[in-house]
């Protein structure tokens, strides 16, 4: 049962957007998916409450913000959305569960500095050897200098860059209905599906 953790200590980098869409991808493949939310804001849980009955099922993994335990039997794939400022024993508990960690990163100097420290902590963690870590650029406008700086930063990390997701209203509109880019006709989100190809391939390894 793969456990995918979406983590970055910086708030507002797109963790919930990434977590819900990763869960949506697994659900689109017919897996028994649980989406856990260790963030006190419970954004992912709220999103699940908006999900229409006709959509592919994604179950709620009841994660107490102060106690993270393994999900129930019968689950084939788990996605865990984590809060900003994740550290200490909660950080350790999350990484004990993780098979894969996706770190979302925005093209901002503040995000880059905060994420660099976090990636160093991941590399030094005692469970680092069993985790795969990948980077996803979030809300990236490829035409900007900031995007170029982000690419320069991630290319020097020695970690796989899974993809760059553009800044689009598609994610906002779909999230408001409890949906993901994997729940609608591909023709409606063609550019976004192209950007997800590398992420999906990495998730399936």
Residue ranges and their predicted role:
Residues 113-130, 138:
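Conserved C-terminal guanine-recognition region of P-loop GTPase G domains, centered on the G4
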Residues 16-20, 115-116:
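Motif I (Walker A/P-loop) of helicase-class P-loop NTPases
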Residues 98-117, 141-143:
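Conserved Switch II/interswitch segment of TRAFAC-class P-loop GTPases
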Residues 181-205:
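NTP-binding/hydrolysis catalytic cores, primarily Walker-type P-loop NTPases
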Residues 32-33, 78, 132-133, 161-162:
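Hydrophobic anchor at the start of a short beta-strand
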Residues 141, 151-182:
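Beta-strand-loop-alpha "switch" segments that mediate conformational coupling across diverse proteins
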Residues 2-13, 20-96, 175-183:
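P-loop/Walker-type NTP enzyme "switch/lid" segment
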């Amino acid at each position: 049962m793969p456990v995918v953790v979406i983590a970055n200590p910086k708030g507002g980098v797109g963790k919930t957007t990434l977590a819900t869409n990763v869960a949506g991808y697994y659900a689109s493949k017919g897996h028994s998916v649980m989406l856990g939310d260790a963030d006190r804001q419970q954004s992912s849980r709220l999103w699940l409450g908006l999900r229409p009955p006709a959509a592919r099922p994604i179950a709620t993994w009841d994660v107490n913000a102060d106690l993270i335990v393994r999900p129930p039997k019968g689950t084939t794939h788990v996605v865990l959305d984590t809060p900003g400022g994740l550290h200490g024993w909660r950080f350790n508990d999350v990484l004990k569960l993780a098979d894969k960690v996706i770190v979302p990163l925005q093209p901002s100097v503040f995000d880059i500095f905060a994420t660099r420290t976090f990636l160093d902590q991941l590399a030094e963690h005692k469970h680092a050897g069993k985790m795969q870590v990948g980077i996803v650029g979030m809300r990236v406008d490829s035409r900007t200098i900031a995007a170029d700086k982000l690419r320069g930063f991630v290319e020097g990390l020695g970690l796989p860059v899974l993809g760059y997701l553009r800044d689009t209203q598609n994610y906002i509109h779909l999230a408001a209905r409890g949906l993901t880019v994997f729940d609608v006709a591909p023709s409606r989100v063609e550019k976004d599906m192209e950007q997800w190809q590398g992420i999906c391939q990495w998730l399936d390894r």
